[in-house]
Amino acid sequence: MPKYTPEEVLDLIQKEGVQYVDLRFSDPFGQWQHLTIPAYEISKETFEVGRGFDGSSIRGWQSINESDMLAKPDPNTAFIDPFIEPKTLVMICDIYDPVTGERYGRDTRYIAQKAEQYLKQTGIGDTAYFGPEAEFFIFDSVEFGTAANYAFWRVDSEEGWWNREVPSSGYKIPHKRGYFPAPPVDKMMQLRNEMVSIMSDLGIIVELHHHEVATAGQGEIDIRYDSLLNQADKLFLYKYIVRMVAAKHGKYATFMAKVLPNDNGSGMHTHFSIWKNGENLFAGSEYAGLSKTALYAIGGILKHGPAIAAFTNPTVNSYHRLVPGYEAPVRLAYSARNRSAAIRIPMYSQNPKAKRIEVRFPDATSNPYLAFAAILMAAIDGIENEIDPGEPFDKDIYSLPPEELEGIPQLPGSLEEALKALEEDYEFLLKGNVFTEEFIQLWIESKRAEIDELRFIPHPKEFELYWDI
């Protein structure tokens, strides 16, 4: 996204005839919130003082007796919304406490900013680069609901392998074979092209896009790496564009980790490296062309993997994806080129600038401010303490017999297991006051409340299994 000063934003509003300004920010759980004000209300003071709003209405934020909050727009994030009329300019905001004048501790964008600053304070590096590959589904119809006497969901897609008659029965993608046939089999190419064109117009550099393994419109758009905060901001915009383009065409996009029970889920493989003074610290002469720094970073991520999964895979649904047989990692191992490992070292290029690791277990239901910050903090801990990642695992982990799997640590099998791991292993996140104990406890309590909400609802499959016993 282009970078602006407050004065340049005000000039842009006048030049483009902007009528409304939309102020956006994330709640703790990764959902964009917004408030809209007429453009004539925007002045230089707006950037200095901010705009007041009710923080008690945001899930996980203030109580009603301390509800006043301030949203201060970041001019560097300004863009003209291509979907909204009349012409509307959007800015992402930082959240402040109006009483103390300080940043709000539950503003997850602040956590991301603190993580970037802490990296510099350690002297290890000055920039952490992230390149997420956020996968999604596009459906033609979606229905779901729960009530006192029912619980159900139903999705459909013209690409769905279960639709064998109409429409386009001659161009169906066979089950789990969506990677990646050309049109007319790939019916979503034009939609993705439109998404990419809008992303490019708004400053998000796209490297490629393609259909994914699952049928029913699963796709992936890969965006070029960027620094932690910039990339997290871009990921919110990425998801917004995907959803809005789908909606424009009467379709429905979702980033849920597991939608279809017998098909691949949607992940967010995250490429990651640390740089200093323009030099890639992950390039070296060790295994797969990595440096010792990179291996220690891997050691930290593997050691703290169960804990950071509470942020990178933050929903009950996330763990329906992390099962064998659907190209998602379940074991905390690392390897070159090996997509069955939790961490893969891509080998596409021998250029030292391209050397990175790919953390394969996250999904796009995560809040990227928290997910990226947690990955970075685990890596820093690994580097500072020279945590040995052990030997690489170059075998296909999915095909190993049980006796060979015993020595390989597992990712959590459920959100409850991930929260338990976070509860027992969060000291590394507190360094530099990046995460606070108060925020971590809020996260654990909120997520356990989600688990309880689901725990008391019988699953429709239970009726098939147990109705007439």
Curated annotation (Swiss-Prot):
InterPro entries: Gln_synt_N (IPR008147), Gln_synt_N_sf (IPR036651), Gln_synth/guanido_kin_cat_dom (IPR014746), Gln_synth_cat_dom (IPR008146), Gln_synth_I (IPR004809). It catalyses: L-glutamate + NH4(+) + ATP = L-glutamine + ADP + phosphate + H(+). This is Glutamine synthetase. It comes from Aquifex aeolicus (strain VF5). Belongs to the glutamine synthetase family. Its main location: cytoplasm. The lineage of its organism: Bacteria, Pseudomonadati, Aquificota, Aquificia, Aquificales. GO terms for biological process: glutamine biosynthetic process; nitrogen utilization. Its cofactor is Mg(2+). Mg(2+) 2 binds at E135, E212, E220. Keywords: ATP-binding, Cytoplasm, Ligase, Magnesium, Metal-binding, Nucleotide-binding, Phosphoprotein. Residues 16-100 form the GS beta-grasp domain. Oligomer of 12 subunits arranged in the form of two hexagons. The activity of this enzyme could be controlled by adenylation under conditions of abundant glutamine. Its EC number is 6.3.1.2. It comes from the Bacteria. Catalyzes the ATP-dependent biosynthesis of glutamine from glutamate and ammonia. ATP binds at E207, H271, F272, S273, R339, R344, K353. Mg(2+) 1 binds at E133, H269, E358. Binds 2 Mg(2+) ions per subunit.
